[in-house]
């Protein structure tokens, strides 16, 4: 055959897939949850959110995530393409759910353009939140997300984070995580 040079570095080809699998193999086996139907997400918090929301929907007799779907954290948007390339040659049903912010837009569009995943299989939180930019956390009601962060940080009642506080702290973004981060940066060092 000889060496072939291609401008499409992310195309899937059996001859190029094996070295990628070998290179990523160790890292992936350390944190991988893979199944025939797989949702690739950015991080472990996304796995927890999707599992908790699915269980809550199931308890309410509503449509929930089919248990045949496995949720796999990839370690960030930058690694989703590698994971998708790695698994695409294995006849797996793969979809991805990722954040969609200013720094993510070009990466998401590049992932869609590579066609590693079938059309319609690259989903963003913005596809479901109704906001132009979103993280998976934006799928929660802002009151619930603020209460979760308040509880996780062990903040006293007078320091509880509210959606109003969050919006005031970062009015230039609609992303709840960025807003709550701004509130947290303004908390006194001795907080809670």
Where are these regions (language model features)?
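Activity-critical C-terminal alpha-helical subdomain
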Residues: 99-191
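RecA-like P-loop NTPase motor core
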Residues: 1-103
């Amino acid at each position: 055959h000889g060496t072939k040079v291609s401008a499409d570095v992310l195309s899937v080809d059996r001859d190029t897939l094996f070295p990628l699998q070998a290179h990523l193999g160790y890292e992936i086996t350390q944190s991988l949850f893979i199944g025939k139907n797989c949702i690739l997400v950015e991080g472990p918090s996304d796995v927890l959110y999707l599992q908790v929301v699915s269980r809550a929907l199931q308890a309410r007799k509503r449509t929930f995530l089919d248990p045949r779907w496995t949720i796999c954290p990839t370690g960030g948007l930058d690694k989703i393409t590698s994971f998708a390339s790695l698994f695409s040659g294995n006849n797996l049903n793969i979809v991805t759910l990722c954040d969609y912010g200013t720094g993510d837009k070009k990466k998401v569009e590049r992932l869609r353009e590579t066609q590693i995943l079938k059309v319609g299989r690259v989903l963003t939180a913005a596809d479901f939140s109704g906001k132009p930019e979103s993280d998976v956390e934006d799928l929660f009601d802002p009151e619930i997300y603020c209460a979760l962060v308040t509880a996780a940080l062990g903040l006293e009642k007078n320091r509880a984070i509210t959606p109003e506080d969050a919006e005031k702290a970062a009015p230039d973004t609609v992303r709840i995580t960025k807003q709550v981060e701004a509130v947290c940066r303004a908390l006194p060092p001795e907080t809670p």
